[in-house]
Each structure stands twice: as structure tokens, then as C-alpha cells.
């Protein structure tokens, strides 16, 4: 079940990264205001 949730999370990140219309401040967790999807 843990692996499934991790795979699902990476799937969501891949979709968000591939979407040119996604804003730069995609909320990944509750209190993240200015998240960078790529993490840099």
C-alpha cells in the first residue's frame, strides 16, 4: 500500500510538471504556498 501511494504521488507530480498551464505555486502539502515542483 505504501508503494502504491508513492507511485500515485509521483504520477501526480509528473502530470503537474507536464502541464504548461499549471501555476508555479502548486500546493503539494497543506501549508506549502510557493512550492517548486522540480524542487530546485
UniProtKB/Swiss-Prot annotation:
GO cellular component terms listed in the entry, alphabetical order: extracellular region
Location(s) in or outside the cell: Secreted
Secretion signal span: 1-18
InterPro entries reported in the protein's UniProt record: Bomanin
Keywords of the record: Disulfide bond, Immunity, Innate immunity, Secreted, Signal
Chief localization: secreted
Listed GO biological process terms: innate immune response; response to mycotoxin
Disulfide topology: 32-35
Propeptide: 19-23
Superkingdom assignment: Eukaryota
Function: Secreted immune-induced peptide induced by Toll signaling. Has a role in resistance to bacterial and fungal infections. The strength of antimicrobial activity appears to correlate with the overall level of expression.
Family note: Belongs to the bomanin family.
Descriptive protein name: Bomanin Short 6
The species this protein was found in: Drosophila melanogaster (Fruit fly)
Amino acid at each position: 500500500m505504501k508503494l502504491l501511494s508513492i507511485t500515485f504521488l509521483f504520477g501526480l507530480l509528473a502530470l503537474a510538471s507536464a502541464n504548461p498551464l499549471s501555476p508555479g505555486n502548486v500546493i503539494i502539502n497543506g501549508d506549502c504556498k510557493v512550492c517548486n515542483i522540480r524542487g530546485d
